[in-house]
């Protein structure tokens, strides 16, 4: 079993990372639709979410097959990172992100950096 599927609760929603910023929804449907009917694809469209997407399959078996086949797949010169969506992990990641932004702001103030 690929590393991306170990210790994850299998479900019909996949979280994709390391996507090209130029990818279109049509290209996503073409790629992920090879493994079964896709109900929805949500591409990240903010600075923090660019290069990520959620792919919702009609059934779990199709999501599992896509996760196994596409994790590490080279697409548009980038290796895809595919995980099953885990809402508990998303909450933790969001908290970590807020803390990292706060720490970054402190460093920027300390050194007088303005971006």
Curated annotation (Swiss-Prot):
One of its Pfam families is RRM_1
Q: Which InterPro entries match?
A: Nucleotide-bd_a/b_plait_sf, RBD_domain_sf, RRM_dom, RRT5_SRSF_SR, SF3B6_RRM
Just give the chief location class: nucleus
GO CC annotation: U2 snRNP
A Gene Ontology molecular function term of the record: RNA binding
Please explain the role this protein plays, according to its UniProt record.
Answer: Necessary for the splicing of pre-mRNA.
Q: What is this protein called?
A: Splicing factor 3B subunit 6-like protein
Its source organism is Schizosaccharomyces pombe (strain 972 / ATCC 24843) (Fission yeast)
């Amino acid at each position: 079993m690929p590393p991306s599927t170990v210790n994850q609760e299998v479900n019909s929603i996949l979280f994709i990372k390391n996507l090209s910023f130029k990818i279109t929804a049509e290209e996503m449907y073409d790629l992920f639709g090879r493994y079964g009917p896709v109900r929805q694809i949500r591409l990240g469209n903010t600075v923090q979410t660019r290069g990520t997407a959620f792919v919702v399959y009609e059934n779990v078996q199709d999501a599992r097959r896509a996760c196994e086949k596409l994790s590490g797949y080279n697409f548009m010169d980038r290796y895809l990172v595919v995980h099953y969506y885990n809402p508990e992990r998303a909450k933790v990641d969001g908290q970590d992100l807020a803390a990292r932004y706060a720490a970054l702001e402190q460093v920027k103030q300390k050194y007088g950096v303005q971006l």
